[in-house]
């Protein structure tokens, strides 16, 4: 693989993840400030999950009909248009519709960019390319930092990050046209109805270990999804500049991403993913005690690199190893399909926990909050109990993968 090709694939990942990080990390805070609550809050936060469900269909299109880089161009252009619409919208329903359309176009790009990178490089080189996605995520904090340092303004919790996302989406669309031609692997082959619907990769579920793997993906997503609402947790703790704070997790992701090939080589896929799950258990235990020992939330954020890299990214590598070459894009789409279904359930579940497990103001004050004035806010949610629930799910997942999943592919 040439240096120029590696550079292009790395830049693709950088832009694609900078795009979503620029607005999604602080979206829950923005919705809170807009007084969007209850079912509408859950619907908006589930748009990422709903978008993931379309991944197999887009994967089919890339596998059989059109070049992957051209599909990526169209999708990113649509994202730019719909995020612009969300930026100018003040009505909750319009915000939901615009974000739903934006995420339906955006989420399939996770599997698509992975497929482009793996097709044009190697599975072994993928982590060193994918790490630039983490770097892009971290770099999204530049908008908050510039606004704060040079304009003395706070953009977290406003609509401005949506405009930032739209701008990056447009740049990503243009850049997609410079990527190496990635023609459909199965073009010209006979296509069945299931292929037309992007369901070809579902045949992989005949493999018992793939079924167990997908069950792990579902459970992991159910436990992980509350992290997308971590901004609300930090806001209740009185933390300022939420996006840069959360980006500490992405910095750790950069460090651990480069260790993925080493981990897989020495301990295999199963133990690597199990270690990522264990790190998530540590996150929720730290988070549960953060109201008593505030600085623990830093530990909960720092382990994000292990959680995301050692499970989410390694899981993509595993399904890539298991999938036949002719359905690589659909296989990545299958992964994100299950991820999306689970995230929809998890979003409503997490919202239910946050809105229904409450603590009285008196108990909140007795905790000795980071900022005394936030005691009333902490009364809204008993975050300790919320994170105990998440820790319980994670502990079960750790047991499940260690007992039922088999390490059936070689590095």
Language model region names:
Residues 1-3, 179-215:
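Juxtamembrane intracellular "pre-TM" segments in multi-pass secondary transporters
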Residues 2-52, 209-245:
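Helix-loop boundary and gating motifs at the non-cytosolic
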Residues 14, 82, 92-109, 218, ...:
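Hydrophobic core of transmembrane alpha-helices in multi-pass small-molecule transporters
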Residues 43-60, 247-259:
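Central cavity-lining transmembrane alpha-helices of secondary-active solute carriers
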Residues 54-67, 148, 256-269, 354:
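Helix-to-loop junctions at the C-terminal end of transmembrane segments
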Residues 70-84, 271-286:
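Structural signature of the two symmetry-related core transmembrane helices
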Residues 100-132:
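Cytoplasmic helix-loop-helix junction between adjacent transmembrane helices
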Residues 148-167, 352-394:
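A membrane-interface helix-boundary motif in multi-pass transporters
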């Amino acid at each position: 693989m040439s240096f120029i090709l590696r550079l292009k694939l790395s830049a693709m990942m950088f832009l694609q993840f900078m795009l979503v990080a620029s607005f999604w990390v602080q979206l829950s805070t923005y919705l809170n400030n807009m007084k969007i609550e209850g079912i509408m809050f859950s619907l908006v936060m589930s748009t990422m999950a709903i978008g993931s469900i379309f991944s197999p269909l887009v994967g089919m299109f890339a596998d059989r009909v059109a070049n992957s880089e051209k599909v990526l161009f169209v999708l990113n252009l649509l994202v730019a248009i719909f995020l612009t619409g969300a930026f100018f919208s003040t009505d909750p329903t319009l915000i939901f519709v615009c974000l739903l359309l934006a995420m339906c176009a955006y989420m399939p790009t996770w599997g698509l960019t992975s497929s482009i990178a793996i097709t044009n490089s190697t599975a072994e080189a993928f982590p060193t390319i994918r790490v630039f996605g983490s770097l892009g995520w971290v770099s999204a904090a530049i908008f908050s930092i510039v606004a704060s340092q040079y304009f003395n303004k706070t953009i977290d919790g406003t609509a401005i990050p949506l405009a930032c996302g739209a701008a990056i989406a447009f740049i990503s669309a243009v850049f997609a046209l410079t990527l190496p031609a990635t023609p459909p692997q199965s073009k010209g082959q006979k296509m069945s109805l299931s292929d037309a619907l992007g369901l070809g990769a579902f045949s992989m579920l005949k493999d018992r270990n793939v079924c167990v793997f997908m069950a792990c993906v579902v459970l992991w997503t159910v436990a992980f999804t509350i992290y997308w609402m971590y901004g609300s947790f930090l806001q209740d703790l009185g933390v300022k500049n939420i996006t840069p704070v959360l980006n500490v997790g992405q910095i750790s992701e950069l460090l651990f991403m480069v260790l993925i090939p080493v981990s897989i080589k020495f301990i295999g896929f199963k133990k690597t993913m199990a270690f990522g799950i264990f790190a998530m258990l540590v996150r929720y235990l730290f988070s549960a005690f953060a109201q008593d020992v505030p600085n623990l939330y830093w530990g909960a954020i720092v382990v994000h690199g292990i959680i995301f890299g050692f499970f989410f990214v390694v899981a993509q590598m595993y399904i890539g190893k298991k999938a036949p070459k002719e359905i690589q894009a659909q296989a990545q789409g299958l992964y994100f399909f299950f991820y999306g279904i689970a995230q929809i359930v998890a979003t409503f579940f997490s919202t239910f926990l946050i809105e229904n497990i409450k603590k009285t103001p008196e108990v909140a004050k007795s905790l000795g909050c980071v900022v005394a004035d936030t005691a009333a806010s902490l009364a809204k949610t008993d975050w300790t109990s919320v994170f105990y629930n998440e820790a319980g799910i994670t502990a079960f997942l750790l047991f499940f993968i260690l007992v039922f999943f088999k390490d059936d592919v070689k590095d």
